[in-house]
């Protein structure tokens, strides 16, 4: 878990760190849900707990709060990786669309002298064949690492917000169907979900947005104009 706290140097390095962070955040969050009686304490007999070298004390501590926090943390880890949770959730909520449109495509279009809205194919072409290739050419490795550092922490908060929303919906459904007793306030839990998304938005506005704008600014004007002219985007 130690390398989880080290900032990634690129997107591929970020992904496994993000999955681990989501696992840990979900585990801690669900433990708090047990403590504040949002979900029941369902214990697991120790004879069913497999011995895992080097992590036995941590597992025993986690299971002291019941099987549900561990089970949901594993579930969150799996959907974080297998379903590419941060990316697909961002697409579903239009975060990626707005990010690309307002912070990358529009500024590049303006610098090329194009003031109209680009269609879907043109926008995809600009992202795939102009923005990404040019950004990869940036030689300042420290600058790139700083960018991924800011993006990494945004995705951590964003992905946790999605998990918090999913858990709220599950708890709400279970309470309505009387599957288990919920002592904690659903309104307070809902406000926590809103707070989580708000913090994600603040992190994006204060760190990711200026870093993205700075990256776009490093693409030379002549490269931008040449690309738009060559691809008949005018």
UniProtKB/Swiss-Prot annotation:
Subcellular location: Cell membrane
Membrane topology value: Multi-pass membrane protein
Sequence intervals crossing the membrane: 22-42, 59-79, 154-174, 186-206
GO cellular component: plasma membrane
Swiss-Prot/TrEMBL keywords: Cell membrane, Membrane, Transmembrane, Transmembrane helix
Coiled coil start-end: none
Protein name: Uncharacterized protein YmfE
Organism: Escherichia coli (strain K12)
Organism classification: Bacteria, Pseudomonadati, Pseudomonadota, Gammaproteobacteria, Enterobacterales
